[in-house]
Amino acid sequence: MAPVLSKDVADIESILALNPRTQSHAALHSTLAKKLDKKHWKRNPDKNCFHCEKLENNFGDIKHTTLGERGALREAMRCLKCADAPCQKSCPTHLDIKSFITSISNKNYYGAAKMIFSDNPLGLTCGMVCPTSDLCVGGCNLYATEEGSINIGGLQQFASEVFKAMNIPQIRNPCLPSQEKMPEAYSAKIALLGAGPASISCASFLARLGYSDITIFEKQEYVGGLSTSEIPQFRLPYDVVNFEIELMKDLGVKIICGKSLSENEITLNTLKEEGYKAAFIGIGLPEPKTDDIFQGLTQDQGFYTSKDFLPLVAKSSKAGMCACHSPLPSIRGAVIVLGAGDTAFDCATSALRCGARRVFLVFRKGFVNIRAVPEEVELAKEEKCEFLPFLSPRKVIVKGGRIVAVQFVRTEQDETGKWNEDEDQIVHLKADVVISAFGSVLRDPKVKEALSPIKFNRWDLPEVDPETMQTSEPWVFAGGDIVGMANTTVESVNDGKQASWYIHKYIQAQYGASVSAKPELPLFYTPVDLVDISVEMAGLKFINPFGLASAAPTTSSSMIRRAFEAGWGFALTKTFSLDKDIVTNVSPRIVRGTTSGPMYGPGQSSFLNIELISEKTAAYWCQSVTELKADFPDNIVIASIMCSYNKNDWMELSRKAEASGADALELNLSCPHGMGERGMGLACGQDPELVRNICRWVRQAVQIPFFAKLTPNVTDIVSIARAAKEGGADGVTATNTVSGLMGLKADGTPWPAVGAGKRTTYGGVSGTAIRPIALRAVTTIARALPGFPILATGGIDSAESGLQFLHSGASVLQVCSAVQNQDFTVIQDYCTGLKALLYLKSIEELQGWDGQSPGTESHQKGKPVPRIAELMGKKLPNFGPYLEQRKKIIAEEKMRLKEQNAAFPPLERKPFIPKKPIPAIKDVIGKALQYLGTFGELSNIEQVVAVIDEEMCINCGKCYMTCNDSGYQAIQFDPETHLPTVTDTCTGCTLCLSVCPIIDCIRMVSRTTPYEPKRGLPLAVNPVC
């Protein structure tokens, strides 16, 4: 009996065991069975689990905000990029958050980092440790929606880390004269005391302003201040602090360690005697606040202050912090941490990593009074730290030379808000170690004497003007913890930033110079910003290849003016006609597309419009062109014009446009709706003969270049382009919108629906949804007509997509829908993005990157994961009992490494230097054409197969399902571990990779065995019917 071909064989049926099936009955499972199921598949901590994960010597990232590229792109796309964004107003350094998130969503990580470091020289540090819930995130408008605020800190960290991996140095503002030609004032000696965040920020901005003799004096043998010594490695790795310090040193800032404030080393008076024109005090608050009951207690007895404990932990866990490598403090048994601020929580979680069995956070007030940010509180809670509120320490009990307990009294708040201690309510808490984290002060009389003659306030802190950061001594400024206004790293950074401008203003005044009334601090610059992205096409010089298409963003000439002010290289006017062809639009006429599904807000992949050409007169546009060219001579203005198939009309209108001063013309032969009914637009652009003749008429009429705007709504766009060239056109625009009907409502009415009759017409679809059509059009024209100039349009929404069109053969790029999604300022992102893409092509060390995307290391939730299979020879997923096994293996590995006590390798930073020329725009035009051809030219010998990285796999089974129901049933799915395995029947179709939600979890690699297609039946078998 012949086999039944339309039934799966037994092997395939086995593979399909877990494939989804439509449900025909309600499910029935016992509660006990479901409890067991839940335990097996659980990924988050079990609420009934009371055992603590072994964290000793585990200093891996624990932040919830950390993002990998996938998470960053999804989160950035979710951002609304609001007008007058509240997130920016809530940031102490006033980061342009909207702009840097825009860059991330466009995969321009360099551009995002440039925006971040321009306003915050410690942008990576702050991305990691900022209490964003109380700052930028607290003002996010998406807080008013179901999905909640954007993870701004995680996005800031991600972009900054990618830039860090690029290893590109900071440079002086390119607009500054060389150092030798700078005015004398810029050689003034400036001293900064303390190498913490405030000083690093202040020095960075002063160096960006052009000052060349800046020295930071630091009493420790390491730099970074509290970022280095008190914020733990698992929240802020030392290589991050070092990276930002190296960026500062790129500008020539000097650091001298081992120099403290004292009569015998550094004083303000000695600095003045040595010729320093200005000084900045950023020494923080170096001494701990302690309760009298701890007087005389030592570390050997089990007592630490946060100022003792955290630096000890840092020195043993932060690679590169100092030359020494000391062991972790040996903390055993129960630990009491006193305090409710961020430092107390850092002490608590650090104690677990030093071996503490249990940690109790004890504080005087209630939970609602905890000063630590919610992010830190939640982390301590997850790590099973215990919280004991309303307790004030009264007595430390010592036996045998060791702390054994602490006695507390209860605190209560009365009706007036005053806190009282109730001596009748006593709590006796056993402990082996006590860590006091009650805050910091400036107490050392030697330091105060060295700061003489500045005045101190009643809190024993320097008197400082909160606007200028100037002390009572005009040449001395201060910022950070020492001032008493900054409570966070980012506020200290802003103090230094604020002070830098007023130090600049002060020094310039000393040399008889003035500064602008409005502060103008320079941006962050690197060699990327020096890349030339200008391009020539048809004899026209474009300052950059990005321009506005003839569409909604150029509705009026004042909009074009604003676009040029923002940085756009060129613009087309909205298409205009002779007065006899003037139009009046309908409404509604521009609507969101359905190609993104039910996604609302910006980031739409398509729009549909039934808008006609400009409602403004030719006279308006001609006068506007004249005005724009007068004020923006370096920008290209192209007049977009449209007539019916009438020689006199085309010659008249083109001559008017030329006379207005337009650099070039665009002949709109492709408007897909409305105008075609009038014998214009599409009615002219679908016939090669009509196109050829119109171009001949215009060529007879004008001397300036002109370009025919082509429609994609034809069978053969090359024949239209060839006709335009034969008619004398200097190039073509490819392409206009695609004709379509976007959608119908449930009652059958269309959207947009005009008037009471709810009528509509086929409109023009634009946006990234039509990019594949536009890319095909550009490449086919470029291949058929080599060297023929092409202005690309159709789904260009980033530097990356723009580069695709340049590689396809276009010379310049027109943008519309991306501006409709956002605003004119996206041009800044496009320019920095394109510069970065070109620059990175010259760095040999980054040749494995895909544009600005680095290779993806194995990770879960954006954090690197150890390859468990290499440690134990077995693959384990990240859930249920397998997750517990993983944690145990990792804990054992961390202890093994601790016992080895290997010295940390030194941190060395050698910025990558271009080893080959940075390509110009002309060098990349048409680069992709060599890879395009017919299907017959493709090799069916060189095949690929899928490989899945089990460490990155999140066990969703999407690869398995698509392979089953849309492919070749070549993936097995383990019923217990949900780990997919690719079988040798994989044909390399790549569907699995296409639906996998994790970037680079699936890769296609070369097939090592010959590919033999499954024919179903042997060849040459007679057909059944």
From Swiss-Prot:
Signal sequence coordinates: none
Record's subunit section: Homodimer.
GO MF terms held by the record: 4 iron, 4 sulfur cluster binding; dihydropyrimidine dehydrogenase (NADP+) activity; flavin adenine dinucleotide binding; FMN binding; metal ion binding; NADP binding; protein homodimerization activity; uracil binding
CC cofactor: FAD; FMN; [4Fe-4S] cluster
Organism: Sus scrofa (Pig)
Pfam families per UniProt: DHO_dh, Fer4_20, Fer4_21, Pyr_redox_2
Pathway: Amino-acid biosynthesis; beta-alanine biosynthesis
InterPro entries listed in its UniProt record: 4Fe4S_Fe-S-bd, 4Fe4S_Fe_S_CS, Aldolase_TIM, Dihydroorotate_DH_cat, DPD_II, FAD/NAD-bd_sf, FAD/NAD-binding_dom, Helical_ferredxn
Location of the active site: C671
Top enzyme category: oxidoreductase
Annotated FAD binding sites: 129, 194-198, 218-226, 235, 261, 480-489
Family to which the UniProt record says this protein belongs: Belongs to the dihydropyrimidine dehydrogenase family.
Annotated GO CC locations: cytoplasm; cytosol
Free-text cofactor note: Binds 2 FAD. Binds 2 FMN.
Coiled-coil features, chain-numbered ranges: none
Keyword terms, alphabetized: 4Fe-4S, Acetylation, Cytoplasm, FAD, Flavoprotein, FMN, Iron, Iron-sulfur, Metal-binding, NADP, Nucleotide-binding, Oxidoreductase, Repeat
Primary location: cytoplasm
N6-acetyllysine modified-residue sites: K384
Entry protein name: Dihydropyrimidine dehydrogenase [NADP(+)]
Location within or outside the cell: Cytoplasm
Binding-site residues, FMN: S550, K574, T575, K709, G767, T793, G794, G795, C816, S817
Positions contributing to [4Fe-4S] cluster 3 binding: C953, C956, C959, C963
Domain 4Fe-4S ferredoxin-type: start-end pairs: 69-100, 944-976, 978-1007
Binding site for substrate: N609, N668, L669, S670, N736, T737
Propeptide residues per the UniProt entry: 1-3
Function per UniProt: Involved in pyrimidine base degradation. Catalyzes the reduction of uracil and thymine.
